[in-house]
Amino acid sequence: MTHQLHQYHLVDPSPWPLTGAMGSLLLASGLAVWFHTNNTMLLKFGLLTLLLTMFQWWRDIIRESTYQGHHTSGVQKNMRYGMILFITSEVFFFLGFFWALYHVSLVPTPELGAEWPPIGITPLNPMEVPLLNTAVLLSSGATITWSHHTMMKGNKKEATHALMLTIILGAYFTALQLSEYMETPFTIADSVYGSLFFVATGFHGLHVMIGTSFLMVCALRLAKHHFTITHHFGYEAAIWYWHFVDIVWLFLYISVYWWGS
């Protein structure tokens, strides 16, 4: 911050946006190749490139904020605006799935048998695994709030324990969702019901895995005393993201599982 007369962080040139874009392209191309040829080599290479980019990029951001002091109050304020806009974009992303779901379910076409769920589809019981998943995810929302409150009081040990419990619940949710996918009596190719079910819940599951990774990084940083009562935006952003995932699941449970049954 020497000789800097403003509060903004002027970042140094970085290769990570380029490698991240390349990794995303390889990942998307690898998915297409996997679907058509059952070859996962390009998919694995793209995923590895993306993971390495994420690790290096996050490392640089942590160094700039924690050790170099570049994240001033003004920078943190702009980061909050950025996170709010990002979550807003995610809201509209999922809104498209809900729009499609209600578009086809409120007025089913003759091709679907003029009923919802379509003829031949046996929906999952919303009172079984989906209800357990709801309880698990809502519990994780409570534990992450507990972690945040105790951290704000300076009790980092209890905050770490609550955060680890949240991570365990997130991993448990993912495992339950995977077991549910393996037992569903329909596939993604079974009419618009199957495609909407797997795409909507699948993207939500992907967000849960991303959020769990986000929280794992925060747990590591919390253990290394990177966060203080006044300087912990990375942790706060992870909490916002996790609560967003909770809320989306509630709408999915009501719309896909309960309404869809």
Swiss-Prot record:
Catalysed conversion reaction:
4 Fe(II)-[cytochrome c] + O2 + 8 H(+)(in) = 4 Fe(III)-[cytochrome c] + 2 H2O + 4 H(+)(out)
Q: How does this protein sit in the membrane?
A: Multi-pass membrane protein
* A GO cellular component entry from the record: mitochondrial inner membrane
Q: Which residues lie on this side of the membrane: Mitochondrial matrix?
A: 1-15, 67-72, 153-155, 224-232
Q: Which Gene3D superfamilies match?
A: 1.10.287.70, Cytochrome c oxidase, subunit III, four-helix bundle (1.20.120.80)
**Any single Pfam family the record assigns to this protein:** COX3
Which of the seven top EC classes does this enzyme belong to? translocase
Q: Which residues lie on this side of the membrane: Mitochondrial intermembrane?
A: 35-40, 106-128, 184-190, 257-261
Matching entries from InterPro entries are given as:
Cyt_c/ubiquinol_Oxase_su3, Cyt_c_oxase_su3_dom, Cyt_c_oxidase-like_su3, Cyt_c_oxidase_su3-like_sf, Cyt_c_oxidase_su3_a-hlx
Write one Gene Ontology MF term.
cytochrome-c oxidase activity
Q: Where are the transmembrane segments?
A: 16-34, 41-66, 73-105, 129-152, 156-183, 191-223, 233-256
> What family classification does the UniProt entry report for this protein?
Belongs to the cytochrome c oxidase subunit 3 family.
Question: What protein does this entry describe?
Answer: Cytochrome c oxidase subunit 3
Native source organism of the sequence: Lycodon semicarinatus
